[in-house]
């Protein structure tokens, strides 16, 4: 099945890489500085920006709204609705209102992507999906997706009417965490769903001390983080949202899209970072263990 490419522009390697606003908007006193940071990311070449109503309690959306209101046609904006903000007695209405509030903060009349932030409260999924479908029909969102869903979650979600329109699934699929390669990635490919990774590369420093990763990076004159990201972007039907913490890191992450790993480099990385295809704990078992 053809992979959907929502939020993407015409340059494939650029299109596969987005900027996550996870660390934006926490403090109003930093809004000006963070606005400059986002403008710098745009100047580097980033065109996909992903927020959430929970990032800075809406602050990330506000910063993005100020920065990109005059550049709206040049960027792709997405946000996420949190299950914790959904009223169980008014699921549909809660999602619609949350979307409208995100649109207000983003200073736009539509989002390119709107995502369910996590898989809790699966009994509400049908109504959440109904809201997504109506928001899409009304032109308030261009596409919708899910986040932190494993293969079991996504399989259940896809049984719902209209779920075949799901465009993306966001996960923690990385070089250091390859479990999703066993089941979630094949499922996404079979359904034409784009798998987007949240590597949070700056948070995986221990993996970057690996001798094989460091050797490949040194041979190419780049950082281990760039090699790890290039590995991620080598997979068909996948993308990544990165979380830079400096302008230098922003540039380095964006430059990673130009790195084409050689077959022997991919083989060495795949051998070093094994793919543990173990039976997952079911959602029911996870809940029972809490």
Regions found by a protein language model. Give the residues of each.
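Short, well-ordered coil/turn segments that N-cap beta-strands
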Residues: 12-17, 45-48, 71-75, 108-112, ...
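Beta/alpha (TIM)-barrel catalytic core signal, keyed to glycine-rich beta->alpha loops juxtaposed to Asp/Glu
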Residues: 119, 123-290
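Active-site groove signature of glycoside hydrolases
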Residues: 103-122
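Structural motif corresponding to the early beta-alpha repeats
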Residues: 75-93, 117
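Short, acidic/polar
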Residues: 28-41, 90-106, 152-156
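Acidic-and-aromatic substrate-binding clefts and catalytic sites of carbohydrate-active enzymes
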Residues: 25-30, 52-61, 84-89, 120-124, ...
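N-terminal binding-site loop/beta-alpha segment at the start of enzyme catalytic domains
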Residues: 1-75
